[in-house]
Swiss-Prot record:
The lineage of its organism: Bacteria, Bacillati, Actinomycetota, Actinomycetes, Streptosporangiales. The keyword Protease does not apply. InterPro entries: NusB-like_sf (IPR035926), NusB_fam (IPR011605), NusB_RsmB_TIM44 (IPR006027). SUPFAM superfamilies: NusB-like. The keyword Hydrolase does not apply. Belongs to the NusB family. GO terms for molecular function: RNA binding. This is Transcription antitermination protein NusB. Involved in transcription antitermination. Required for transcription of ribosomal RNA (rRNA) genes. Binds specifically to the boxA antiterminator sequence of the ribosomal RNA (rrn) operons. One of its GO terms (cellular component) is cytosol. One of its GO terms (biological process) is transcription antitermination. PANTHER family: ANTITERMINATION NUSB DOMAIN-CONTAINING PROTEIN, N UTILIZATION SUBSTANCE PROTEIN B-RELATED.
Amino acid sequence: MGGSRRRGSRHKARVRAVEILYEAEVRGVPVSEVIERRRAQTEPPINEFTEQLATRVDEHRARIDELLETYAIGWTLDRMPVVDRNILRIGVYELLWADDIPDGVAIAEAVAMAKELSTDESPVFVNGLLSRLMEKKPSLSL
């Protein structure tokens, strides 16, 4: 029972990380600024997992975006909806850099967020792109 509750809170934390990345991108401000503002204004306080996830995605963003551009067949980063871009950034980060998160969980969580936050087509797109990256994972240079 505790595991499902933890998964639920982790899912919410991931959604909040997407919101932080989205806000930073749309407003053109650093992720750290959005985190600081939310830390000061949010009740209950911002979750540590959320903060770490958003920060780490931001730290690896250049390489993540290169990988998305390379493996998103028929799509450029600019053509993707902003929310999808940020869901994918989290998925790629968790898939390639978060060793404590199984690949299947990283993909399933990203697909779940796409279902919750984006268009009807987004879950299939997110699943396909992250699955392609998972297959390529052994040969990717990070």
